[in-house]
Regions:
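Core of compact, soluble alpha-helical bundle domains
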Residues: 1-136
Length: 136
């Protein structure tokens, strides 16, 4: 920590720092790191750019993100524990990098996103436990 007050407002610079710091930690994490590594290998920069666009769209309403998160996550071997770890790392990173309204908004949106993804992937506490569709 450099002694400067943590930012309370979200900016593109803060988003870039958050994404880069957070996903640096994700890459090193023994639980969720291997899932990302299997999907991305060493080619992280395009993914980080997409995530910067995603968080800019979510928090600043920039409209830069043009993806389909549910479809991207569907083939991954995700379980509730992966989302819990993702949220834990994200909250810790956010708390180190910003405060006040910025901190609240990032953490709130992360929880909503995690919940939405889990529902769409039919995992977690709100899973409907629907029968699997037969292969077409």
């Amino acid at each position: 920590m450099n002694g400067h007050p943590l930012p309370e407002r979200i900016s593109e610079e803060l988003i870039a720092e958050l994404v880069d710091t957070f996903y640096g930690r994700v890459r090193q994490d023994p639980l969720i790191g291997p899932i990302f590594l299997a999907k991305l290998g060493d080619d992280w920069e395009p993914h980080l750019a997409k995530l910067r666009d995603f968080w800019s769209s979510v928090t600043l309403m920039s409209g830069r993100y043009r993806g389909k998160p549910q479809q991207v996550h569907m083939p991954l071997p995700l379980e509730t524990r992966h989302f819990e770890r993702w949220l834990s790392l994200f909250e810790a990173t956010v708390s180190e990098l910003c405060s006040g309204p910025a901190r609240f908004l990032f953490i709130d949106r992360a929880h909503r996103i995690a919940e939405s993804l889990q529902i769409s992937l039919n995992i977690g506490p709100k899973a409907l436990d629907l029968p699997q569709r037969a292969a077409s």
